């Protein structure tokens, strides 16, 4: 098996603050507690620089270097991550949750993290057809490319 050399007992879970990722996080925590496994919550984020402004017919020239995110932007993402964890776990979870904030596309970040895991858990928004093709599917990419088993969790339906 491709994942046999990975650290024993590591579960990676993708987190983005959505109800689906909250459900995945709770499921992964329960599974980690059952397996006595290490739980790594991964939040992938991308920096999108603001578009330079120019008058019609002019070439836009950025006023500053947008090659990376500022500390304030990173701090805002870290706060979103912590809020998502607090929302998923109103009380202390049964396992320690290692937090990992990684800059990059979620699908590829989770694929890379899967190389060091025995199990990856992701949420699914349930998109299919054209919506999935146009918007992409992180869960599908991870299922197709991870070298270890992947569990896809849907958020419970209200009602």
Per-range role (PLM):
Residues 2-65, 113, 117, 158:
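Small/aliphatic-rich secondary-structure junction motif
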Residues 29, 74-81, 106, 115-119, ...:
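Conserved N-terminal glycine/acidic-rich loop preference
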Residues 35-38, 95, 119, 148:
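Short glycine/serine/threonine/alanine-rich loop segments
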Residues 40-42, 98-102, 151:
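General small-molecule cofactor/ligand-binding pocket signal
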Residues 61-79:
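A short acidic, glycine-rich active-site loop
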Residues 90-98:
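A short helix-to-beta-strand connector/capping loop
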Residues 105-110, 138:
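Short acidic active-site motifs
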Residues 119-144, 155, 159:
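Glycine-rich, Arg-bearing micro-motifs that act as flexible, cationic patches
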